[in-house]
């Protein structure tokens, strides 16, 4: 009896063990099936019925080269008071000229002697003009002489001190009725005090009217950076009578634009301020020689001694105050230069390393 009981217990344990082994086999087989199904699914993704994948290749775009015609502008600090100096300052009955007392003046006749230009003269050796203005003026007269062989030109008016301007003003106003536009500016409000202006006459009759041979000068002066400052049809704007003998230097791109569009300096200054600010559209210009320029206006920060002005890097630029409310920047887009050499004639308020990049724009 006891032996039968032991045999029965062994049989039960054996059956239990076999059952557990069988269950484990089923579980393992199921797990293997799940893993295999997962692998099969990752390796077999059906094609979309909407795409013909025969010969289909994925195109990876090539890295783009930087546009060489794009200019990076940086913010550079300039003395706010510099808005009162430069080629484009507006000096008229409403806007006084503020002298820096260190104008770089040269004697016209001394420069003629140095450069052996004997086909025009000035009244005497005391007649001076800003040095940067002499060369374009002399070159214009030289080209005129080569065409017409006319050596009768004389510079009859150039830089004037305020004291001399006062003498002229007193002399002319004593004989004027006051009914017409003035021909002599109020002291302190004369372009002649800037050194950027000169008056032509001729040594035969001392009556230059820009006619005959001299018409060439009045017609072509813009190519050398000059304008006829007081045009015949702009008296209501300039408040001066027509003066065909009075030439004012503003630079080639600006003289070109004003001449092509028949506008005077007052109108040009207003146009740049209203339409061509740095934040908006810039004036794009090509001169008669094919040189390209980009021009824009930046308002001065009159609440501070320093105005931060966006200027280009890698290309030459000029900056001028307008003597009213800001700065005009002229970018010579064809003239590539190294960083730091964009405008060697301008001294910023602080070191150039303080500049900050602002944005990139494209040259058209």
PLM-predicted stretches and their roles:
Residues 2-158, 162-364:
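Extracytoplasmic cell-surface/polysaccharide-interacting catalytic and binding patches
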């Amino acid at each position: 009896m006891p032996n039968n009981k032991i045999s029965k217990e062994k049989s039960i344990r054996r059956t239990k063990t076999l059952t557990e082994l069988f269950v484990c086999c089923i579980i393992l087989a199921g797990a293997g099936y799940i893993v295999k199904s997962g692998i099969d699914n990752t390796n077999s993704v059906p094609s979309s019925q909407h795409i013909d994948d025969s010969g289909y290749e994925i195109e990876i775009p090539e890295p783009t080269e930087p546009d060489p015609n794009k200019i990076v502008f940086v913010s550079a600090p300039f003395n706010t008071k510099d808005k009162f100096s430069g080629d484009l300052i507006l000096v008229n009955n409403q806007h006084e000229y503020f002298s820096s007392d260190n104008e770089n003046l040269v004697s016209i006749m001394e420069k003629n002697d140095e450069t052996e230009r004997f086909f025009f003269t000035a009244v005497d050796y005391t007649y001076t003009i800003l040095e940067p203005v002499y060369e374009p003026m002399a070159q214009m007269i030289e080209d005129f002489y080569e065409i017409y062989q006319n050596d009768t030109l004389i510079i009859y008016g150039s830089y004037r001190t305020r004291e001399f301007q006062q003498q002229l003003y007193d002399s002319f106003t004593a004989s004027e009725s006051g009914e017409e536009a003035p021909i002599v500016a109020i002291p302190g409000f004369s372009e002649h005090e800037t050194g950027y202006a000169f008056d032509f006459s001729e040594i035969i009759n001392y009556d230059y009217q820009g006619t005959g041979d001299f018409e060439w000068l009045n017609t072509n002066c813009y190519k050398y950076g000059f304008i006829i400052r007081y045009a015949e049809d702009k008296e209501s704007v300039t408040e001066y009578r027509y003066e065909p003998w009075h030439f004012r230097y503003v630079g080639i791109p600006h003289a070109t634009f004003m001449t092509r569009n028949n506008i005077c300096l007052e109108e040009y200054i207003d146009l740049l301020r209203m339409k061509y600010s740095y934040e908006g559209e810039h004036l794009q210009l090509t001169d008669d020689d094919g040189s390209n320029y980009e021009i824009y206006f930046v308002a001065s920060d009159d609440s501070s001694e320093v105005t931060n002005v966006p200027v280009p890097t890698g290309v030459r630029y000029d900056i001028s105050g307008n003597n009213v409310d800001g700065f005009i920047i002229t970018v010579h887009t064809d003239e590539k230069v190294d960083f730091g050499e964009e405008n060697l004639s301008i001294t910023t308020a602080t070191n150039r390393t303080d500049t900050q990049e602002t944005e990139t724009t494209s040259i058209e």
